[in-house]
Amino acid sequence: MYMGVIGKSPEIEILRELRGARILITGLSAVAGVDIARAFADIHARLIIHTTDMQPEVTELFALLSQNAAEMKLYTNPIARPEDSIRLAQNAQQAYGGLDAVINLQSISSAEMQSIATQEQVETLIAAKLSPLTHITHVAANRMRVVLSEGSVLNILTAPKPQNAREAAIAGIARTALAAMTRGEAGQWADQAVRINGVGPRSMSAQPAGATLTNEPDIAALALYLASKRGKTLSGHVFDADGLFAGGA
């Protein structure tokens, strides 16, 4: 939804506005978040990058990002436990004296899809995926409230394109959980000028409300738009993604 309005190429005023913006990106890996990080680095934002993926291609990416970003800080500790995700959000807030936008990345892998055999396993997996996003969203939004700062949080949960009805059902449950979290958080922070949105697996049971995000440059353009003043009227929405980050863990 709304991608027809947002477009795929950020307008020049958005790029100027976000120059020097303080951006936290969590969950970056070789298969998720590369184009998003590049998009913000290219407009000379100040980046805080979280990753646990230290493959050679990822370390090469960091070198490239550091050349273009106004500043960059890197965190590599796992954030699966609540205390770890909270600590990351707090450290990120302190890095540049606050945050203007947060992009949290999570993906359900093909292997995880295939390993699920029960409803309980589905619920456990989705809870594990959404928990860090929820804690980081709370800390970031609360800090924005305290300092009377407008801000944006975009929580991205993607899954590979379903190969059968069972996988489609899992993706649908994941989207429903993300949508509930997004609406709840958006409602909680609505009067504080903090915007909460999501990107989730496209529902196979309904026609999408707008264009579907089919590649990461689409998501990068969306993240730029939502972080800018142009996106200040959008909160509580979950945008459709189709089969992204299929190799993610």
Q: Where are the language model's segments positioned?
A:
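Active-site loop of short-chain dehydrogenase/reductase
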Residues: 21, 71, 97-101, 144-159, ...
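Rossmann-fold scaffold of SDR-type NAD(P)-dependent oxidoreductases
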Residues: 26, 99-110, 129, 155, ...
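C-terminal helical subdomain
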Residues: 2-7, 191, 198-199, 209-247
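Canonical Rossmann dinucleotide-binding motif of NAD(H)/NADP(H)-dependent dehydrogenases/reductases
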Residues: 9-48
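Conserved glycine-rich Rossmann-like NAD(P)H-binding loop of the short-chain dehydrogenase/reductase
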Residues: 44-60
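Amphipathic alpha-helical dimer-interface segment in Rossmann-like NAD(P)H-dependent oxidoreductases
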Residues: 90, 127-148, 186-187, 191, ...
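Catalytic loop of short-chain dehydrogenase/reductase
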Residues: 108-109, 115, 124, 145-191, ...
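Conserved mid-core segment of classical short-chain dehydrogenase/reductases
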Residues: 78-90, 94, 107-124, 167-170
